[in-house]
A protein has these predicted regions:
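Membrane-embedded alpha-helical bundles that constitute the cytochrome b-like, heme-associated redox core
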Residues: 1-210
Length: 210
């Protein structure tokens, strides 16, 4: 019965052939550190799943944001698990993406013809960093308040554009806008970059280690 179901699924989806083709692709030897790219992608998928769960309970306004987080953590079944998995997953994602970038840079895998792989990877790191910063702000507790204040003051130190950008950040700040950036704008940007990154990897393959 299982084989019949597999045959039925294979005819309609071709998933078996897809898996066989992926397993048959040649991978250069001694590229174990390259696995941090795949680990990062797996963590991104986990962040999506835990984030969708949190969407059902989080309230994006200053008066109820922290209360909704506390309710989810203390009253909802397994809410504490999903929240902590999301919180610690963000830190782990930042670490694995950075490790992947350092490995690629050290092995000079960014060189011709893989410059666009490197550029899209750097942009993905920046997007992940913005995910972490915006995620810290969303509970809107004392840590969120001072994190935003510190980042705004840091932006003000930028030459020429610092003060104008600081004013925009202060004048347009609302928890709801940060929430929309975190759950709509940044995910769209990240998955577009991921798609481009995977297309480039498919086109050029994995770089041979030096």
């Amino acid at each position: 019965m299982i084989s019949q179901f597999y045959d039925w699924l294979e005819v309609r989806t071709g998933v078996g052939e897809f898996v066989r083709n992926k397993k048959a692709q040649a991978v250069p030897a001694n590229v174990y550190f390259y696995c941090f790219g795949g680990i990062s992608f797996f963590i991104i998928l986990m962040q999506v799943l835990t984030g969708v769960f949190m969407l059902f309970f989080y309230t994006a306004n200053p008066q109820e944001a922290l209360q909704s987080i506390e309710y989810m953590s203390n009253e909802v079944s397994f809410g504490w698990l999903f929240r902590n998995a999301h919180r610690w997953g963000s830190t782990l994602l930042l670490a694995t993406v950075l490790t992947h970038m350092v490995t690629v840079f050290y092995r000079k895998a960014y060189r011709n013809p893989r410059e666009f792989n490197w550029i899209s990877g750097v942009l993905q790191f920046l997007v992940v960093f913005l995910f972490v910063v915006s995620g810290i702000i969303l509970p809107w507790d004392w840590r969120a308040y001072w994190s935003y204040a510190i980042w705004v003051d840091y932006v003000a130190t930028w030459p020429i554009i610092g003060e104008p950008v600081k004013n925009v950040l202060l004048d347009t700040f609302t928890i709801y806008r940060i929430f929309m950036i975190h759950v709509v704008i940044l995910p769209i940007i990240l998955f577009l970059l991921l798609y481009f990154h995977f297309v480039m990897i498919k086109k050029h393959g994995i770089s041979e280690p030096l």
